[in-house]
Amino acid sequence: KGDCKGIAISVLNPENQTEMINYAAGSVPLITHDSDAPDSNRLFFLGTENYQAGRELGKLIKKSMPEGGKLMLYVGKIDQLNSIQRRDGLLDELADKPAK
């Protein structure tokens, strides 16, 4: 409480942080940004549609490498929700899978 008027958080691990987010959201307005905790009591999520962003990256890669080739994917934090969603979108696009 105190002088805090609100909280904006980029969630590292929604499964482990949702309880804390819900506790804080009971006292002040709380939003998530960049990486979400969709099952929390946050007011809203502000950020990229991460799965679609991954698909768009896949389209650019296919356009820039029309003959195919080798590709290395680096993900900073593989278990973070936004990373998972972006990676899934990229891999689905590269494999020509239908969008989710």
Task: Please report, for each region that a protein language model flagged, where it lies by residue.
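A residue-level marker of the well-folded mature domains of exported/periplasmic proteins
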Residues: K1-K100
